[in-house]
Amino acid sequence: MINTSPLLNYVSSHHDIKAINQWRTDVEKQLQDSYENGQSIREIIKARSDLVDEALVFLWKHAELDQSKLGLFAVGGYGRREMLPYSDVDIMILSEDEISEENEKRISTFISSLWDVGNFKPGISVRTIQSCVEQAATDLTVATTLIEARLITGNTQLAKWPRRIVSQTWTDKTFYDAKMAEQAKRYHQHNNTESNLEPDIKNAPGGIRDINQIGWIAKRHFRVNRIYDLVHLGFISEFELAVLEEAESFLWEIRHHLHRLAKRDENRLLFDHQREIAAKFGYVRQEGQPVNYGVEQFMKRYYRTAQQVSTLNEMLLAYFSESVITPRLPNYERKIEVVNDHFKIVDNKLAVQHHKIFAEHPSAILELFYILANRPDIEGIRARTLRLLILAAKRINQSYRDNPEHQALFMSIIRSPYRLYDTLVAMKRYGVLGNYIPAFGQIMGLMQYDLFHIYTVDAHTLLLLRNLNRFREPEFAKEFPVVSSVFQRLARQDIVFIAALFHDIAKGRGGDHSELGAEDAIEFGRAHGFTERECKLIAWLIQNHLLMSLTAQKKDISDPDVVKDFAEKLGDMEHLDYLYTLTVADINATNPKLWNTWRASLMRQLYTHARDVIRTGLGRPVDYQMLIEDTKFAASELLVNNFALADVEKVWQELGDEYFIKESADEIAWHTQAILKHGDNPEPLVLLRAHRKAAQDAVQIFIYTRDQPNLFATTVAVLDRMNLDVQDAKIITASTAFSLDTYVVLDRFGTLLTDPEREETVKNALVKALSQPDQYPGLMQRRIPRQLRHFDIENTVDVTLNEALQQNMVEISTLDHPGLLARVGGLFMMQGLDIHSARIATLGERAEDIFFVTKKDGKPLNNEEVKLFSEKLKAALDEASNQICQH
């Protein structure tokens, strides 16, 4: 029992209605105290609804509506007695006939008093029975609210009418079809997934609306008031009801905290609130645990809960359709096809032959999915079969996993050429995959608290498998021509499938997830018929699944030594082919924004160069002189028809060997042609073109100008102002004191090369800034994205010496924010450092950038200078991060 102050203690007379404000404030505090003292959320929200009833009854009488024949109904969540702190108070005033002028005045007084009181957020409709009929017939929302309309006070004869109206205006089928279409639209608005990074816990798949949906459809047909009443009718089991009620209470508690923190009706579990709400549920990081452990465990519970809710929603509503709606259709005849002794296909859905199949033949659990994987014409699983399957999945134990028949069935599913992804998603959804591979069950719902990994680990893993499977399909071969060709010639595609399944399976355990996952995979592989050599290959792929992406992202792959070192780690073409397919599929399954033609070109270049090294022999040293001569010859072939070779050589002799080692013949010819045409023009030369190896979304910008101290800082500041994101930079200083700079940029608007006016604007901005070296453009003030303010990222600076280049390599990891590169470039300028090249990577909210620098005299920093510079750069990054958090 929750003790709250009686309203009459505050309103001694009907003229004192504004005292209701104070009463509501006081009882709200009493409700919160009760909640904090252990009262269930279910009791709290019901008590709040009852208190609102009490206030409305008082105001109804205050307006003298108790003397009318009108009825006051609670609708929506209020009608279900589900009131959160800032929920709307949705009410309907119902009349049998046209409302008299006197009653209209009373209603006006009542509505005014609701607004005068102030703490209510009323949503009010005033209807006659006839207008209800007319509106319900054409408006699904009106019909839905009528199903759960609850009489608060007034004419009791009206209590039966709301549901009666829905029965008159909608059949079981029309209402079901309309609500399912509405749900499909709602799902689409939330990306058809339960695991959005900032989920709407009310409306997203697996949210409160999914539970409401079951109630609306079932209550309309069975004429019951509570979902609990459906147990006695056999529509839902006691176990299923318990799961739904536990999930509902958890979701209500989250909403309760969201309302309190936001001080409004908030349903989105934003990054702003996730960590604080996690702590309220007791998910707090302990000493020694990762910094985001608490919030990630809380979100894991949420995602698992949402998965349970959406699965029950799917199953129960399918059961309603199959048991109530379909058999009533005119001229209905079931289409039945016998598959074998265990299964049949009924109306295009798979069903068991009898209800004891899974108990008597446990292998049928996996057999069902083998049939689904190999019969694309089957549309799903019958609801009764699904109910049996979900229960049977709980009986999968070690003895089941060790059965050779079951192991063979599982591998047959993995090797299915048709719809592997859909089948594995179903196996996960219905509890089979997580029970058959317990380690997979541990990562279900596990999120990583960042903007880089936008899927839970289990969802990401299955998307990776989907991507691999797509490399078989002609329509995706156009999008991924090289990797599709490589994948299709793999001797054993199931090897990379198992590597994909286990590559992240040890996340969340602590320790190196690649090493732990490799151990799990070896054990699994041995049990499932892989040879020792194949198991070692699977383990190697898992241990090295980040090798290729990190090499392409963080190293200069135009450097032959970098490629040679990478190729030596692989050893042969088999390892390269498997790793390439796994890496491309992995990147595409992490974040759709991560993959673009620039990154694709990096991966393709690294694969091609490594392939050439492996084919010509790993033991052979790089012949730099031959490489330079070959590149010069190829470039001169592109220039010979338009320029005298003597003029070409004059330009080239000012450039060092490194230029001809790292630039392609095509780019050298482009640069040389531009320089020769530019002649003695004192203005900086700026050219733009589509990146030849990366298509339209990557743009090359070539700058030829007199060398100056702030060249990089000025350039990146201008590019940031032009909404261009730098991905790569190469700065070559000729012996004539001219600088040849090549930038690869991604255009935030995607119009740079199709809009001549914008292209000219970018060129002019660069020319103007570079012509005035003393006027360094200030950093542009941009709005910091809301999401960035909630990530606690440690800023790191690592400065090492590259012996071969005699340059310092500066690696920074920091919170990405607008103007970061320009800020860093300005600091390099102030410290008197020249940047020779840069590799820029943005991974969600994190920036991981690498710069190669020297002092003005061309020498690297010494140890003391490195220490001093590192401290200054770290301090600058810390200051920038603090400013972001304070905004």
Curated annotation (Swiss-Prot):
Catalytic activity: [protein-PII]-L-tyrosine + UTP = [protein-PII]-uridylyl-L-tyrosine + diphosphate; [protein-PII]-uridylyl-L-tyrosine + H2O = [protein-PII]-L-tyrosine + UMP + H(+)
Activation/inhibition comment: Uridylyltransferase (UTase) activity is inhibited by glutamine, while glutamine activates uridylyl-removing (UR) activity.
UniProt keyword terms in alphabetical order: Hydrolase, Magnesium, Multifunctional enzyme, Nucleotidyltransferase, Repeat, Transferase
MF annotations from Gene Ontology: [protein-PII] uridylyltransferase activity; phosphoric diester hydrolase activity
Repeat in keyword set: yes
Domain ACT stretches: 700-782, 809-887
EC number: 2.7.7.59, 3.1.4.-
Cofactor(s) it depends on: Mg(2+)
Region (Uridylyltransferase): 1-337
Pfam family, one: GlnD_UR_UTase
Residues covered by the HD domain: 457-579
GO biological process: regulation of nitrogen utilization
Region (Uridylyl-removing): 339-699
Membership in a protein family: Belongs to the GlnD family.
NCBIfam families, A to Z: UTase_glnD
Function as written in the Swiss-Prot or TrEMBL entry: Modifies, by uridylylation and deuridylylation, the PII regulatory proteins (GlnB and homologs), in response to the nitrogen status of the cell that GlnD senses through the glutamine level. Under low glutamine levels, catalyzes the conversion of the PII proteins and UTP to PII-UMP and PPi, while under higher glutamine levels, GlnD hydrolyzes PII-UMP to PII and UMP (deuridylylation). Thus, controls uridylylation state and activity of the PII proteins, and plays an important role in the regulation of nitrogen assimilation and metabolism.
Domain notes: Has four distinct domains: an N-terminal nucleotidyltransferase (NT) domain responsible for UTase activity, a central HD domain that encodes UR activity, and two C-terminal ACT domains that seem to have a role in glutamine sensing.
Protein's UniProt name: Bifunctional uridylyltransferase/uridylyl-removing enzyme
Lineage of the species this protein comes from: Bacteria, Pseudomonadati, Pseudomonadota, Gammaproteobacteria, Moraxellales
Gene that this polypeptide is encoded by: glnD
